From Swiss-Prot:
Annotated compartments: Mitochondrion
GO cellular component: a single term: mitochondrion
The entry's keywords: Mitochondrion
Listed name of the protein: Uncharacterized mitochondrial protein ymf22
Length: 79
């Protein structure tokens, strides 16, 4: 799998650094955890955007590398 799993630098959310759209589609961690793609947040720069349309997520990923933060765990340090 391209990309790596790491923690968000601003909180304790699990974050996935996905390098391209194919990685997002085939990410074993996503499949294993049965992540609902509607819960995917795309982090670009300092903005956090929610894309409920999977095609929109893919479009963004194909344009540039983004940090995908999966809102599946409660944050211990909300911000």
């Amino acid at each position: 799998m391209e990309g790596s799993i790491k923690n968000c630098t601003q909180c304790d959310e699990a974050s996935y650094d996905i390098l391209d759209a194919d990685s997002l589609r085939t990410c074993e961690a996503l499949v294993r955890q049965k992540i609902d793609f509607e819960e995917i947040y795309i982090k670009q720069h300092n903005d956090r955007l929610l894309f409920k349309d999977m095609n929109k997520v893919v479009e963004v990923l194909e344009r540039k590398t983004v940090l995908v933060t999966l809102k599946t765990y409660p944050t211990r340090n909300p911000h």
